[in-house]
Amino acid sequence: MKWVTFISLLFLFSSAYSRGVFRRDTYKSEIAHRFKDLGEQYFKGLVLIAFSQHLQQCPYEEHVKLVREVTEFAKTCVADESAENCDKSIHTLFGDKLCAIPSLREHYGDLADCCEKEEPERNECFLQHKNDNPDIPKLKPDPVALCADFQEDEQKFWGKYLYEIARRHPYFYAPELLYYAIIYKDVFSECCQAADKAACLLPKIEHLREKVLTSAAKQRLKCASIQKFGERAFKAWSLARLSQRFPKADFTEISKIVTDLAKVHKECCHGDLLECADDRADLAKYICENQDTISTKLKECCDKPLLEKSHCIAEAKRDELPADLNPLEHDFVEDKEVCKNYKEAKHVFLGTFLYEYSRRHPDYSVSLLLRIAKIYEATLEDCCAKEDPPACYATVFDKFQPLVDEPKNLIKQNCELFEKLGEYGFQNALIVRYTKKVPQVSTPTLVEVARKLGLVGSRCCKRPEEERLSCAEDYLSLVLNRLCVLHEKTPVSEKVTKCCTESLVNRRPCFSALTPDETYKPKEFVEGTFTFHADLCTLPEDEKQIKKQTALVELLKHKPHATEEQLRTVLGNFAAFVQKCCAAPDHEACFAVEGPKFVIEIRGILA
């Protein structure tokens, strides 16, 4: 890369990086500006999401009252921007509203202490009290009751959906939740007219639920990336992902979008939902206005209404790679000015490398691309200080192959195991693996994480070879982030803390490399853990599996060195015991008699 070309690129990148695509206007009343930009319907939806994500135990009706009051105030400010308090920031207005709730301390305890702070510390305090694992009952869809609610009051139905999802997922990407609420309403508009409502509704609700849970996990990872590793980490992630998806767009264009995408997500992660949604709409508008230079896959997206448009852009298919790309080695190994370019503008040079490498490797996971970029950076940092830098970094690309081989081999082995055992058996294998690695982690967390890790088989193993790596590693990043988020609240394992905090891009390799914890002191055998009742027979299959897997974790915590043969025998006997009692005329009586015998059996097998 010639120096004059690089300087031109640096100037363009620096300008785009600092400026982005948004205008940074100031307004007399921020809340009036957002209300006018978003419109009343979306404004009310976003305010409802904001309150629900902070006050997760509050009844829906209380939130509706708060939303109504904020909306009326916003309308006052639209009519007269100089009216009392209209010049206050949205953070201040929102925080004041929370702190005015009389029962705040009674229902939320320490959250009320935040009210003694000033902005922005008060808002940061509110964020720290969000609960990623709230004690809220699982929703069980009743098609007849739901259709009755939908037909009685569509607006309330829409609001309750936002409320229920937001309070269970306090970092859900708010404008995307508005999109899913539209899809949810559409499902009910169609299925509540059907003769068999359940047959129409239940598969569609389950399909939507999977998409919503994945969306929640993706946003939680983005927020964790920004909160724990800084904005630069998120920008690097976005640069790699967008370069893969839009390989025809030039580096400066991608950099502009990355800068503003970081702003949008930082706003949503910090609870600035109105500004986040407004800026996301502006970014979608910019991308569509410039789609000719960004991607050929956006036309269909750009013809859609706002929420569908933004969602469609985020999920857009990868564009074809330009045919005239030079080999990467030309600019990043063979060019004699590599060290000069690197030293003069490290971030731009490394960003260019990541952009060029990512657009050529749509089959790699983002984490792998970032690990490769880290190795390239470390090599230049070392070589550019030596007497003959070109000779030193001449073989840098050879260092990348082991980074690629490691996840490929791991995925191959695990997919073979998945094919052999099936999903439930594969989950059990992962439960054994992770309980031995980090037995200090709570049993519910180990079961949840292992079950989700096990889903990588059905999600990714049947995909074409060129899609497997990115599918598996990107999905595993979401699941391991869930483990890290839960563990941060109640840290019990130094190994988990180390893997979670040292490097975002090396999390998965760190967890994969963990060995069984030989320092762990086994738990005492608790008979109550292996006591079961008649309700086990009527549980849905997934809940029945969770009961069995919970027992498996507890078994391993008692006997961490149990052999595969011992565990297989115990699980086989357990299945036979459950089958016998669930087939008996009196389930409870059978469990009462056979249960103690089963416990004696377990202890004998593991002795």
From Swiss-Prot:
<keyword id="KW-0186">Copper</keyword>
<feature type="modified residue" description="Phosphoserine">
    <location>
        <position position="89"/>
    </location>
</feature>
<keyword id="KW-0106">Calcium</keyword>
<comment type="similarity">
    <text>Belongs to the ALB/AFP/VDB family.</text>
</comment>
<dbReference type="GO" id="GO:1903981">
    <property type="term" value="F:enterobactin binding"/>
</dbReference>
<feature type="disulfide bond">
    <location>
        <begin position="499"/>
        <end position="510"/>
    </location>
</feature>
<feature type="modified residue" description="Phosphothreonine">
    <location>
        <position position="569"/>
    </location>
</feature>
<feature type="disulfide bond">
    <location>
        <begin position="339"/>
        <end position="384"/>
    </location>
</feature>
<dbReference type="GO" id="GO:0030170">
    <property type="term" value="F:pyridoxal phosphate binding"/>
</dbReference>
<feature type="binding site">
    <location>
        <position position="282"/>
    </location>
    <ligand>
        <name>Ca(2+) 2</name>
    </ligand>
</feature>
<dbReference type="GO" id="GO:0046872">
    <property type="term" value="F:metal ion binding"/>
</dbReference>
<feature type="modified residue" description="Phosphoserine">
    <location>
        <position position="82"/>
    </location>
</feature>
<feature type="disulfide bond">
    <location>
        <begin position="460"/>
        <end position="471"/>
    </location>
</feature>
<feature type="binding site">
    <location>
        <position position="267"/>
    </location>
    <ligand>
        <name>Ca(2+) 1</name>
    </ligand>
</feature>
<feature type="disulfide bond">
    <location>
        <begin position="77"/>
        <end position="86"/>
    </location>
</feature>
<feature type="binding site">
    <location>
        <position position="33"/>
    </location>
    <ligand>
        <name>Cu cation</name>
    </ligand>
</feature>
<feature type="domain" description="Albumin 1">
    <location>
        <begin position="19"/>
        <end position="209"/>
    </location>
</feature>
<dbReference type="GO" id="GO:0005504">
    <property type="term" value="F:fatty acid binding"/>
</dbReference>
<feature type="binding site">
    <location>
        <position position="272"/>
    </location>
    <ligand>
        <name>Zn(2+)</name>
    </ligand>
</feature>
<feature type="disulfide bond">
    <location>
        <begin position="147"/>
        <end position="192"/>
    </location>
</feature>
<feature type="domain" description="Albumin 3">
    <location>
        <begin position="403"/>
        <end position="600"/>
    </location>
</feature>
<dbReference type="GO" id="GO:0072732">
    <property type="term" value="P:cellular response to calcium ion starvation"/>
</dbReference>
<feature type="signal peptide">
    <location>
        <begin position="1"/>
        <end position="18"/>
    </location>
</feature>
<feature type="modified residue" description="Phosphoserine">
    <location>
        <position position="442"/>
    </location>
</feature>
<feature type="disulfide bond">
    <location>
        <begin position="191"/>
        <end position="200"/>
    </location>
</feature>
<comment type="function">
    <text>Binds water, Ca(2+), Na(+), K(+), fatty acids, hormones, bilirubin and drugs. Its main function is the regulation of the colloidal osmotic pressure of blood. Major zinc transporter in plasma, typically binds about 80% of all plasma zinc. Major calcium and magnesium transporter in plasma, binds approximately 45% of circulating calcium and magnesium in plasma. Potentially has more than two calcium-binding sites and might additionally bind calcium in a non-specific manner.</text>
</comment>
<feature type="binding site">
    <location>
        <position position="272"/>
    </location>
    <ligand>
        <name>Ca(2+) 1</name>
    </ligand>
</feature>
<dbReference type="GO" id="GO:0015643">
    <property type="term" value="F:toxic substance binding"/>
</dbReference>
<feature type="disulfide bond">
    <location>
        <begin position="537"/>
        <end position="582"/>
    </location>
</feature>
<keyword id="KW-0597">Phosphoprotein</keyword>
<dbReference type="GO" id="GO:0051902">
    <property type="term" value="P:negative regulation of mitochondrial depolarization"/>
</dbReference>
<keyword id="KW-0488">Methylation</keyword>
<comment type="subunit">
    <text>Interacts with FCGRT; this interaction regulates ALB homeostasis. Interacts with TASOR. In plasma, occurs in a covalently-linked complex with chromophore-bound alpha-1-microglobulin; this interaction does not prevent fatty acid binding to ALB.</text>
</comment>
<feature type="disulfide bond">
    <location>
        <begin position="114"/>
        <end position="125"/>
    </location>
</feature>
<keyword id="KW-1015">Disulfide bond</keyword>
<dbReference type="GO" id="GO:0005615">
    <property type="term" value="C:extracellular space"/>
</dbReference>
<feature type="binding site">
    <location>
        <position position="270"/>
    </location>
    <ligand>
        <name>Zn(2+)</name>
    </ligand>
</feature>
<feature type="modified residue" description="N6-methyllysine">
    <location>
        <position position="557"/>
    </location>
</feature>
<feature type="domain" description="Albumin 2">
    <location>
        <begin position="210"/>
        <end position="402"/>
    </location>
</feature>
<dbReference type="InterPro" id="IPR021177">
    <property type="entry name" value="Serum_albumin/AFP/Afamin"/>
</dbReference>
<feature type="disulfide bond">
    <location>
        <begin position="99"/>
        <end position="115"/>
    </location>
</feature>
<feature type="disulfide bond">
    <location>
        <begin position="288"/>
        <end position="302"/>
    </location>
</feature>
